[in-house]
């Protein structure tokens, strides 16, 4: 990184606890045009990256560097040249390597794929036909695999190869840290959804994610949806960073320009999300630490004083454990596990099961007069015993309502179409277990047994 960054006000980078890796994730600038709007917004985010002390070991760019999407190869090459020589000219790429993911603005046909190979010269260790498009990098105990989520040889946007991915993960099974990078998400973000155009197509998605889970991948890092988002599915994080300069938000009023500074060490992953002014807007430590037994408290059946009021601050979460037996088959009613409320207002939080499939559901109310947002998870099997753990983790935004079964199960985020989550919830002063705020007959739990405990961290 150029020494010029020393004149900026420094931003202290997170550092590994002992040996590890310190790096930056960002993407989606749609620039490469001199004097364009996105050139200015990208410069603002780059100014933040340049203030990081110490500088990152490497940078992962999740795609859409340039506006692209042109049939003219010379125009496309000129955009790449402007982006590399002028917009990223401050960076010493020999000292701080940058690895790029393919994307819909940069690799949209065979011509643009060839251009990507030529101008970026990424490693040529990918599957046949995808050399320089899909590839892997090994740095000590870290493996980073880049997958092409729009290969022309497989069908274009939203299509991704999986056999090679599985082979590379098997070959490098000894890597302590495994990251996979691709442009398109697998799981919808902020309610913006659509197979192929916004996520990897359904004929690939399940196999793709199962490979990540089975190989012990820590995170799939993506972009495309103009937001920062984190969620977890079967223990694997999906981290979306797509705010490096494109002057649109998904949605406006919630999302913001940003970059992500992250570290990996023997204890896991930590990151901080910095906006274009250098302010830390979001952060996370993963995996979730196990809570000691003394943190857990039984929540009595019926109505009681809440164990938590107000908002969850950074790093804080609420853990619930629900044990019992599900209602019999044929039960269709909404059934309450726990409700949090204040007298005279609709409960801002309801946790329970709904419908004939007894689907785990969390409902968070927002502003008065506005519809609440719904999160959906697994089904409870009729009449079966269950040991359900549920977490409200403000640092994960809309991905921060998580569940698992048993102490050793893998965490998964409940699915939602919201751009916000428990971080905006003002926890009220009353809780009720086994029924909702209206009393004993209000959406009561219909199984023969239910016990609840909670821990605040």
List where the protein language model places each region:
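Residue-level marker for buried hydrophobic side chains located in beta-strands
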Residues: 23-25, 59-61, 100, 180, ...
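A short C-terminal boundary segment appended to hydrolase-like catalytic domains
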Residues: 263-315
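N-terminal active-site segment of His-dependent metallophosphoesterases
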Residues: 1-77, 189
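Active-site glycine-centered loops adjacent to acidic/histidine catalytic or metal-binding residues
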Residues: 28, 63-64, 103-104, 183, ...
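Extended active-site neighborhood of metal-dependent phosphoesterases/phosphodiesterases
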Residues: 2-11, 70-177, 195-219, 227-265, ...
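Short acidic, glycine-rich surface-loop motifs adjacent to enzyme active sites
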Residues: 172-191
């Amino acid at each position: 990184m150029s020494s010029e960054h020393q004149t900026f006000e420094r931003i202290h980078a997170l550092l590994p606890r002992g040996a590890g890796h310190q790096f930056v994730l960002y993407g989606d600038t749609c620039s490469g045009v001199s004097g364009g709007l996105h050139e200015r917004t990208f410069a603002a985010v780059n100014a933040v990256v340049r203030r990081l002390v110490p500088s990152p070991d490497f940078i992962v760019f999740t795609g859409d560097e340039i506006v692209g999407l042109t049939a003219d190869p010379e125009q496309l090459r000129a955009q790449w040249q402007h982006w590399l020589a002028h917009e990223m000219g401050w960076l010493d790429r020999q000292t701080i390597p940058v690895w790029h993911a393919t994307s819909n603005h940069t690799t949209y046909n065979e011509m643009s794929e060839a251009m990507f190979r030529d101008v970026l010269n990424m490693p040529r260790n990918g599957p046949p036909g995808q050399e320089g498009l899909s590839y892997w990098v090994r740095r000590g105990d870290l493996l980073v695999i880049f997958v092409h989520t729009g290969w022309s040889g497989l069908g274009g946007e939203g299509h991704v190869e999986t056999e090679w991915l599985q082979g590379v993960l098997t070959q490098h099974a000894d890597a302590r840290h495994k990251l996979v990078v691709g442009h398109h998400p697998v799981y919808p973000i902020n309610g913006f959804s659509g197979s192929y155009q916004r996520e990897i197509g359904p004929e690939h998605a399940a196999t793709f994610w199962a490979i990540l889970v089975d190989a012990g991948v820590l995170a799939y890092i993506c972009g495309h949806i103009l937001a920062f988002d984190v969620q977890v599915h079967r223990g694997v994080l999906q981290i979306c960073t797509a705010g490096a300069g494109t002057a649109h938000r998904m949605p406006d009023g919630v999302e913001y320009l940003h970059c992500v500074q992250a570290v990996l060490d023997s204890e896991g992953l930590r990151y901080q999300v910095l906006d274009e002014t250098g302010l830390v807007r979001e952060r996370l430590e993963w995996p979730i630490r196990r809570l000691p037994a003394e943190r857990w408290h039984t929540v009595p059946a019926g109505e009681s004083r809440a164990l938590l009021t107000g908002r969850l601050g950074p790093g804080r979460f609420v853990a619930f454990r629900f044990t019992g037996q599900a209602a019999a088959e044929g039960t269709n009613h909404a059934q309450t596990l726990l409700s949090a409320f204040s007298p005279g207002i609709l409960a801002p939080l309801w946790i329970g099961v709904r419908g004939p499939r007894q689907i785990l559901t969390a409902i968070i109310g927002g502003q008065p007069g506005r519809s609440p947002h719904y999160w959906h998870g697994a089904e409870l099997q009729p009449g079966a015993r269950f040991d359900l753990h549920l977490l409200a983790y403000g640092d994960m935004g809309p991905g921060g309502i998580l569940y698992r079964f048993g102490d050793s199960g893998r965490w998964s985020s409940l699915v939602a179409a919201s751009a916000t989550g428990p971080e905006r919830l003002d926890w009220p002063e009353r809780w009720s277990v086994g029924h909702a705020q209206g009393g004993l007959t209000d959406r009561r739990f219909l199984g023969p047994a239910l016990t609840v405990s909670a821990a605040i961290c």
